[in-house]
UniProtKB/Swiss-Prot annotation:
Family, as annotated: Belongs to the class-II aminoacyl-tRNA synthetase family. ProS type 2 subfamily.
Quaternary context: Homodimer.
Keywords: Aminoacyl-tRNA synthetase, ATP-binding, Cytoplasm, Ligase, Nucleotide-binding, Protein biosynthesis
Catalytic activity from the UniProt record: tRNA(Pro) + L-proline + ATP = L-prolyl-tRNA(Pro) + AMP + diphosphate
GO-annotated biological processes: prolyl-tRNA aminoacylation
GO function term, MF aspect, one: ATP binding
Enzyme Commission designation: 6.1.1.15
Designated name of the protein: Proline--tRNA ligase
Keyword Protein biosynthesis: yes
Gene Ontology CC terms, in alphabetical order: cytosol
Subcellular locations according to the entry: Cytoplasm
Pfam annotation, one family: tRNA-synt_2b
Domain of life: Bacteria
């Protein structure tokens, strides 16, 4: 893609309304634009990142055996009355009526809808377990939306829901998602620490938040530093191995980890002083086991092995891709701009032509772009008639993993320059060696 033809509305000045790093950088890098309080348009660069985050989330959900569906955003109020949550949810829920005066709502979550889908189509324990998930837009009318997409009113959410015959089977479904989330965050270049959490309005008696450490985090967290080096299960992890998966979850919950809401200073004091870590953190995922909280009032039942009907045991599991984009920036940036992990970078390579109009530079850039794209790498080619300094600033701001710098002086010696955005390391090399070099690194 040529930058001269791309839509990248970069801002030179830092917007006054942006309070945290990710909000400032997403606005400045032309990733998003605010349309109303807590509501954002995702522009081309931001959408590429958002789609890549969703691809990783989707791949790990599928690997764990979850099945993707898509449920309506506008939901019937009567379903929420069945579960008892319609009045309890509060003003965060946007309520509306259609032309026939039927009460509807803009779904902040989907436990009721997915339970209705399940009860209408599943009758026997032989059809279990099931884990259904979607990636869709949600709306919560926050009193004070802030921090850009970190705490917006409209947001993209992966919400999943499991259905099992009993508590033991439901716990295994919970563990599957627990492990799949560990893998998801690792693939996104994040170290997420699971912490026991309050179940809040969703309910239930078992819940974990997944927290990444960041200086601008909204919560204070306390944990054992052992979590920073714990190995994440590999792609070959067997999600059907009940004991093996329980062992992974036990290992990842054996050390102290708590947000300020659940923190117990006396228990934390038992952690060796050298291993205690107090920091700021950002919630990037939340999982719940809530038993029959929804299935009992909504009569989501199956026939068990003994022929009697019983309510299914349920769990719900959330990751916010739009929030994850901001969280990744909070965890990975410097004074010059964003530093994208390879897995979710909008493009792999920023190709910088230092002298547009120079025949040798133009030809070399065209050949390099073709070679990189043939090798499976995505390229954003800065072919604008701008000063080199402006091009370098743009490349650093948008944070693509690699910068390939092509200028007349280097080409005279048959060389180009390669820069790694994360480390700042530079090297000169022959253009023909470039694709293999990037692939190897």
């Amino acid at each position: 893609m040529r930058l001269s033809r791309y839509f990248l509305p970069i801002l030179r000045e830092t917007p006054k309304e942006a309070e945290i790093v990710s909000h400032r950088l997403m606005l400045r890098a032309g990733m998003i634009r605010q349309e109303a309080a807590g509501i954002y348009a995702w522009l081309p660069l931001g959408l590429r990142v958002l789609n890549k985050v969703c691809d990783v989330v989707r791949a790990e959900q599928d690997r764990a055996g979850a099945i993707e569906i898509l449920m309506p955003t506008i939901q019937a109020a009567d379903l929420w009355r069945e579960s008892g949550r319609y009045e309890a949810y509060g003003k965060e829920m946007l309520r509306l009526k259609d032309r026939h005066e039927r009460e509807l709502l803009y779904g902040p979550t989907a436990e009721e809808v997915v339970t209705e889908i399940f009860r209408a189509s599943t009758r026997s324990y032989k059809d279990l377990p099931k884990n259904l998930y979607q990636i869709s837009w949600k709306f919560r009318d926050e009193v004070r939306p802030r921090f850009g997409t970190m705490r917006s009113r409209e947001f993209l959410m992966k919400d999943g829901y499991s259905f099992d015959i009993d508590q033991a089977a439901a716990r295994h479904s919970y563990n599957k998602v627990f492990v799949s989330y560990l893998r998801t965050f690792e693939r996104l270049g994040l170290r997420a620490i699971p912490m026991r959490a309050d179940t809040g309005p969703i309910g239930g008696d078992l819940s974990h938040e997944f927290i990444i450490l960041a200086k601008t985090g909204e919560s204070e967290v306390f944990c054992d530093q052992a979590y920073l080096d714990m190995p994440v299960p590999p792609p070959s992890v067997d999600f059907d191995d009940v004991a093996g998966l329980q062992g992974v979850v036990d290992a990842w919950t054996s050390h102290y980890a708590a947000t300020d809401e659940m923190h117990d200073e006396a228990v934390f004091a038992e952690v060796p002083e050298a291993s205690r870590l107090s920091a700021r953190g950002i919630e990037v995922g939340h999982i719940f086991y809530f038993g029959t909280k929804y299935s009992t009032p909504m009569k989501a039942v199956v026939t068990g092995p003994d022929g009697s009907e019983r309510p299914v045991h349920m769990g719900s599991y959330g990751i916010g891709p739009s929030r994850l984009v901001a969280a990744t920036i909070e965890a990975s940036h410097d004074e010059a701009g964003i530093i994208w992990p390879d897995a979710i970078a909008p493009f792999d390579v920023a190709l910088i032509n230092l002298k547009v109009g120079d025949g040798a530079c133009d030809t070399a850039c065209a050949e390099i772009q073709a070679a990189l794209e043939t090798a499976g790498l995505s390229v954003l080619y800065d072919d604008r008639d701008e000063r080199p300094g402006a091009k370098f600033a743009t490349a650093d701001l948008i944070g693509l993993p690699w910068q390939v710098i092509v200028g007349p002086k280097g080409l005279a010696e048959g060389k180009i320059e390669l820069k790694r955005r994360a480390s700042g390391e530079r090297e000169t090399l022959d253009p023909v060696d470039l694709p293999a070099r990037i692939r190897r690194l």
